[in-house]
Design a protein with these regions (language model features):
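Terminal helices and disordered tails flanking the catalytic cores of nucleotide-processing hydrolases
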Residues: 1-5, 248-282
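Conserved alpha-helical "signature site"
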Residues: 1-246, 282
């Protein structure tokens, strides 16, 4: 079954609030659409209230509380406020796991947040890949959204078949394609396309397991690296393990090796308390 057919047949799709959808669409031209994005945040009372609560939480760590979106922008900068607003809208969908498995939903959201923090660090170390920070952060947050769709599309027997193939050594993507005909990356990209998201978000979601690095590396390479880094959190980190899961040609295309991995893991490890708090608060 093709990815677009899977998305079309699932009735219980992830739901993104209208204000968040508008913010995502404005990422098409993030620099030009700054005022429009700020207007969306300010004119949505629910989003503004959630944003101020998050800004005043321990996850952000401001020295004094802010009482308005304007104050939040003054202290944090617009790009950071935009990222926080997007995370609030996206988190509501990714935290929810269909069929009652709330624990899995929280784990998926936590992994997505770790990946978003990781891609921000990686992008700062690889200036050759020209990417807008809010776009990179948001793409990383949404890279696994297709898993929510597949969890609704797959029957219990199909889920068991996917698990069986993974236990036999296949990757999750290969197992999903073998059982249903498409993997979560393809399905997630189709979902974003149905929401009329910009190509800058769809491409890295579609290719985060098969990143595009020819003729030049793009955001899918950074999200791929960040996803692999995020999976190293909580396990024995190091290049020996990392090199077995990463696309080494993609990593080489941006000069990402053992030295860069060690730096990112050390920096990200020092931020994990903040990451954990953010995942809980957003």
């Amino acid at each position: 079954m093709a990815a677009n057919e899977i998305v079309a047949q699932v009735t219980n799709l992830p739901v993104i609030p209208a204000a968040t959808l508008k913010l995502l669409q404005l990422l098409e031209n993030p620099t030009e659409n700054t005022q429009a994005a700020l207007d969306v945040i300010q004119t949505n009372a629910v989003l503004s209230a959630k944003l101020l609560r998050l800004c005043n939480s321990a996850a952000i760590g401001l020295r004094k509380p802010v009482a308005s979106v304007e104050q939040a922008v003054f202290f944090l900068g617009f790009s950071e406020v935009q990222r926080l607003a997007l995370a609030l809208g996206i988190g509501g969908s990714l935290k929810r796991k269909p069929k009652g498995d709330e624990t899995h939903g929280r784990e998926l959201w936590h992994h997505s947040v770790v990946t978003a923090y990781a891609v921000s660090l990686i992008a700062s170390e690889i200036p050759e890949v020209d990417v807008e920070p809010s776009v990179a952060f948001t793409a990383a947050l949404m890279h696994d959204i297709g898993k929510l769709v597949l969890s609704e599309a797959l029957t219990a027997d199909m889920l068991a078949a996917v698990r069986g193939k993974m236990q036999s050594g296949q990757s999750q993507s290969d197992a999903e394609r073998a059982v249903i005909g498409a993997d979560h990356a393809e399905v997630g990209a189709c979902l974003l396309a149905s929401w009329r998201m910009p190509a800058a978000l769809i491409e890295p979601v579609a290719n985060h397991h098969a990143p595009i690095f020819q003729p030049a590396p793009g955001l899918s390479v950074l999200v791929h690296l960040a996803n692999c880094v995020a999976h190293q959190i909580g396990v024995k980190p190091g290049w020996d393990v990392f090199s077995t899961v990463v696309n080494q040609e993609a990593a080489a295309s941006v000069g990402f090796g053992a030295k860069q991995l060690a730096l990112i893991l050390e920096t990200l490890g020092g931020q994990m308390d903040k990451v954990d708090q953010f995942a809980l608060a957003a």
